[in-house]
């Protein structure tokens, strides 16, 4: 296995333009494909997850032109639901942002589809979405294990009426149903069971649906109504915001080490909840400055904080390694859904933090980190999880090197992450 050893970084400073947001890129690609007209997406993320979505759209007969650097994509929409005369198998890697929304969208038209992916994808639950789709008349079957991909979908359309979705495990199930709902037979009402996790990701979905011409009535995140008679219309130009989760590593680096880092491509009016990471960092003692399309982080003396991160679970991972440099205890609470991400992130984070010497308590839905005076040089296993690799790169901001196993796993969302980090390291 390939590994990368990062030597201690003395100082960080500079500016980094963020790659496009994964969450925004894949939502916008799908809605552009379902639209009438042509959408020109700029600052599209070039990564594995986006590639899986683009490959699937190609198989589904969608025309698009991709620029040489793969960050500009012109999509000609099919003007409604996908249909296919031949049976198709779509391989979606480990891309939840492709698997879940496509599972819902493919129920709308005609055709027979198998949705599959990497071994880890077959361990990531999808049962709450499938239950809701079946409630709306969809024909979906599990090909291996109940409640998990791979799925076989026979397009039959989605009925109007009321469905219930359990929101307690992943907001992607609701996102998937919301994006398919305007193309159902009539008005759709979605009722939420349990506590809806990651609400800011639903805000992203609703915002992008509106940009493509569809209005959703949001009754306090308990019920969503998609009125009948709507369809997706290409907005023409669509700018993909920089990825807020990717910003977290650089903002944390400046807060930990001093110097000043400016991230561009995202700002105070971002539609991504993960930008609230900067608020958490500020609570820890960092100095944060906001602009319309940038955020600046400067050094503060960091202290541990105890916080609920249910609203920003992805960015919260960066807090776990930032905690190694804070005075006192840091508690990250209400993040059960870390367990159903690219890996079981609670178990993985606890294991790897202990390797570098931290005292860690891992609970069912929380992690508590106590730093140590001197970190230990360790080889960090990344579990084929891009965020594990990027989070643990921050260990190099100590006086101790860190070795990252399988650094290439960052290709899921940020292929040139380590190059960007090197550019900012003095």
Curated annotation (Swiss-Prot):
Pathway linked to the protein: Metabolic intermediate biosynthesis; chorismate biosynthesis; chorismate from D-erythrose 4-phosphate and phosphoenolpyruvate: step 6/7
Residues where phosphoenolpyruvate binds: 22, 96, 124, 172, 345, 387, 412
EC primary class: transferase
A GO-annotated cellular component: cytoplasm
Active site (catalytic residues): 314 (proton acceptor)
Compartments (UniProt record): Cytoplasm
GO molecular function, one term: 3-phosphoshikimate 1-carboxyvinyltransferase activity
Coiled coil stretches, renumbered: none
Domain of life the protein comes from: Bacteria
EC number(s) reported in the record: 2.5.1.19
Reaction equations catalysed: 3-phosphoshikimate + phosphoenolpyruvate = 5-O-(1-carboxyvinyl)-3-phosphoshikimate + phosphate
Keyword vocabulary terms for this entry: Amino-acid biosynthesis, Aromatic amino acid biosynthesis, Cytoplasm, Transferase
Subunit structure: Monomer.
Role according to the record: Catalyzes the transfer of the enolpyruvyl moiety of phosphoenolpyruvate (PEP) to the 5-hydroxyl of shikimate-3-phosphate (S3P) to produce enolpyruvyl shikimate-3-phosphate and inorganic phosphate.
Protein family membership: Belongs to the EPSP synthase family.
Record protein name field: 3-phosphoshikimate 1-carboxyvinyltransferase
Species: Vibrio atlanticus (strain LGP32) (Vibrio splendidus (strain Mel32))
Taxonomic lineage of the native organism: Bacteria, Pseudomonadati, Pseudomonadota, Gammaproteobacteria, Vibrionales
Gene: aroA
